[in-house]
Amino acid sequence: MSEALERLIDQGVGREPADIVLKGGRFFDLVTGELVASDIAISGERIVGTCGDYEGREEIDVTGRIVVPGFIDTHLHIESSLVTPHEFDRCVLPLGITTVVCDPHEIANVLGTEGIQYFLDSAMETVMDIRVQLSSCVPATHLETSGADLPVGRLTPFRHHPKVIGLAEFMNFPGVVNKDPVCLAKLDAFQDGHIDGHAPLLRGKELNGYLAAGIRTDHECTSAEEALEKIRKGMHILVREGSVSKDLQALMPILTERLSPYLALCTDDRNPLDIAEQGHLDNMIRTAISAGVEPLAIYRAASISAARAFGLRDRGLVAPGWRADLVIVDSLENCKAELVLSAGRRVTDALFAGRKPVEPVGLDSVKAREVKAADFGLPYNEGETSVLGVLPGKIITEHRRYRLPAEGNRTGVDLDRDIIKVAVIERHGVNGNHANGFVQGFGLKKGAIASTVGHDSHNICVVGVNDDDMALAVNRLGEIKGGFVVVHDGKVTGEIALPVAGLMSLEPYERVRDTLHHLRQAAFALGATLEEPFLQLAFLPLPVIPHLKISDRGLVDVDRFMLIG
């Protein structure tokens, strides 16, 4: 018997003092639903004792507090926080998020395997446990230009890395159902691991075929009816509440104790400003309980059910033998983390300071050609023009059709109906593609907003009222090596540089948060009415989410999975 195992047993039995003992509080038993008054003994990374009195080398008074298992975000793109994995760690771990299951899909689309390796290297050094799903759809579709291509042979060398769980969200659901050979090769290679799903509005027998391929989770449900069908068919539903995609309210009816073993929580895409102002999974928990969800249901979804869905069998309960990922909160309802333990370590500034840094990658990833105002013109169309219809708080965009006014021999914007221009410019140095269109719902009355964050291939996406400002915004992105830019009347009125693959900042998250606040104000000054104009801009080029999108190759009818202009 190893000395380490003997030590765990001795401290659990009480033969010797535990390394840490939480004294005087109660813990939330997610099996029985009870609040149990008890000391909690910890040895190294593991809980070794509950339901009794213990002595510890270090004793922490948690009188009047409640101890709950650490929270698990089951699907997110860390890149959407606009900070590096190290800064994300420092940003959300103090809120109680002790494990995240991330898909480095964004950086993989820009840098390929170099981006995945960067995330794996970072995950080995962070305090929180970052688990990585291997990006399954790079490029996401044939309807856009990506900076990389990841066939199955480039993914399999990573599959046995200690931080890898399996295959990330399989977005090309038409490819699965229609037996695309490239899709099937990836699915076949990961049949013995976890395969994450992505199946918005997929129902009936097509859903059956998708699930028959071994896919087990979905974070794209936007209605309780859709979620229930998927639960009936064996899926774990990851209830999402991000900065743009907000599905928690719609899925409240399924957040019950009965269904909680088949539910988990995720954020998908959440920026540091929202994290600072509202929180992360802790905010989801507060929101759900205030709306009438039973605490047992939502806390299960935040921990034990999430862990089981992804095969993380060592965490999710406050019980002997389980990983000491613990959050000490003031109350179940408020869910305010007062102390966090990650693998038995107190989360402090000193703990973060002791991490080994990881060198950033992709610092010269923006290779777009310089554009001119004339590049944004579209020939006048006397008939109806397809227009992307933005829905606040949703990444689904409607396919709308309008007769638009003429500006000389070009089609013009229609501010009375909130219709402005949108364009996508290829920025990986592959082909120089440039596609133009129209979008409704941003509220802009002047100026332009541009971004190198444009799911999923992360080409440049720009919306604007006049061509000169659009051109300036796009060209400025090249100068700052990626990020967000706001322009009005020929002047840059706001910007944030994201030089790591054009997706993430090298600055501390506090500075990113503050800069993003000023950037949002600059967008509002143009008339923007969306709560998250930059993240909604970033989803306009996403051709795997219905109904009409725009890529560097043109307008995409997602329902028919084809280019239409």
UniProtKB/Swiss-Prot annotation:
Sorted UniProt keywords: Hydrolase, Manganese
CDD domains named among the record's database cross-references: AdeC
Record's keyword annotation contains NAD: no
Catalysed reaction equations from the record: adenine + H2O + H(+) = hypoxanthine + NH4(+)
GO terms classed as biological process: adenine catabolic process
Family, per entry: Belongs to the metallo-dependent hydrolases superfamily. Adenine deaminase family.
Protein name: Adenine deaminase 1
